[in-house]
Amino acid sequence: MPRILIIDDDPAISDLVSINLEMAGYDVQQAVDGIKGQALAVQLQPDLIMLDLMLPKVDGFTVCQRLRRDERTADIPVLMLTALGQIQDKIQGFDSGADDYLTKPFDVEEMLARVRALLRRTDRIPQAAKHSEILNQGPLTLVPERFEAIWFGKSIKLTHLEFELLHCLLQRHGQTVSPSDILREVWGYEPDDDIETIRVHIRHLRTKLEPNPRRPRFIKTVYGAGYCLELSTEEGGGSPT
């Protein structure tokens, strides 16, 4: 039975989420502030964390950053569930390490669909990494077991989502991949208008791979259509991390 940790100081929301998750067959644990939530994440090793942002003691952005820096919790998927719905809030959430972001008030069925998609996508291991083969094209090699890109001979460590997104683009290199297809293949759910999710992670990839992320040569935006990975023998510029 998958275990889900809810970190939220609003008992009405926590109880609503817990009841629906338990009815769907999940084991649910709760924490009411950021410090307790981080400690429980280490102790319980849940399959998914649902994280509010406006928490006592330590805010959700900071909690997520700490979870990502701790090797014991770095791979646990995080779904931010919060009343902060501005674009900048979403960008900050993804920048802090969230896998998905859902704004309150939310539809319960959509929440459950996001949970299923995250658990299905990760299963604590990204879908692309379930395949053992190394994928190579031109100057780019993806090593699934280490979530690593070899880019013009340089080793670049990727997050799980960055790896899956780059894997998706590499499989269709030279072709435009629509945001809808990316959301289906990488995040595992039917697309809505959640394009900002993709933009943030594309920006992260460009920071690691492009010599000038503001003027990308390899991961290109095809306006109105999607994104295209164009590989050439001209050297890229991301610094190994």
UniProtKB/Swiss-Prot annotation:
InterPro entries recorded: CheY-like_superfamily, OmpR/PhoB-type_DNA-bd, Sig_transdc_resp-reg_C-effctor, Sig_transdc_resp-reg_receiver, WalR-like, WH-like_DNA-bd_sf
One Gene Ontology molecular-function label: phosphorelay response regulator activity
One BP term from GO: circadian rhythm
DNA-binding segment(s): 132-231
Protein keywords: Activator, Biological rhythms, Cell cycle, Cell division, Cytoplasm, DNA-binding, Phosphoprotein, Repressor, Transcription, Transcription regulation, Two-component regulatory system
SUPFAM superfamilies xrefs: C-terminal effector domain of the bipartite response regulators (SSF46894), CheY-like (SSF52172)
Subcellular location: Cytoplasm
PANTHER family: DNA-BINDING DUAL MASTER TRANSCRIPTIONAL REGULATOR RPAA, REGULATOR OF RPOS
UniProt-recorded name of the protein: DNA-binding dual master transcriptional regulator RpaA
Organism: Synechocystis sp. (strain ATCC 27184 / PCC 6803 / Kazusa)
